[in-house]
Amino acid sequence: YEDTDALHPLGTPGYASYGGTSMAAPHVSGAMTVLMSRYQDMNAIQVRDILFTTARHTNTDGSLFTGWTAEDGVPDVLYGWGTPDLDKGMFGPSQLLGKFEYKVNNLDVWSNDISQKALDARKVEDQAWMKATTNGTDTSAVYELGEAYTGMKNIENAVISKEDAEKWRHEYYKKRAEAIQNKIDNGLYDGSLVKNGDGTLVLTGNNTFRGGVTLNEGSLYGFNDSFGITETAAGK
């Protein structure tokens, strides 16, 4: 408790209900810790991707979160990926967000269906941005710059000049365009799986990622529909 009144002096133990990002952070961190104990052969970024892609955006009755507007499998502008779903997170990722290089030292089974919906959505967004900015060279969009700063006092250079804003936008556009072009040139808009390590990975889901599967070490097992979609006549 905060030291707000005589009944609740500072340091008195008790329970209370809080909301917002301050309380969301420890819950997400706790979920991440549980998943890291489940996937001990993965690095933190890989476990984070499982946390993201297996999150849910529905209430206990199956209804969507209030205000949820994104398509299934795509982060929402308000909620992001949603709420961690540890039950689903136990069974592998639900999407590949790029090249997933997994060094398996033991046995792991992924039974979730694995797609690349978020990657597909990002590709559409990036293509639209490249077109709107002429591949990052057109920085003439409106600059919403104020003439005065009304926040904290004694802040130097609080008002950004048009010249600085143009310079920063040009640098940002250039870097973003280069990053997008690199994804295009190297096929990074398709999720792929690379199996390393002496262990065994078993895939049992109906998987629709399009970047393929590479087995470098150990063993890899799965159904016909578990290795993603490739550009063959049969789609396998």
Residue ranges of each PLM-predicted region?
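Gly/Ser-rich catalytic serine loop of serine hydrolases
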Residues: 14-28, 188-192, 205-213
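Signature of short aromatic-glycine-proline-rich micro-motifs recurring in repeat-based ectodomains
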Residues: 81-84, 189-194
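Surface-exposed loop/turn positions within long extracellular repeat scaffolds
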Residues: 185-190, 202-236
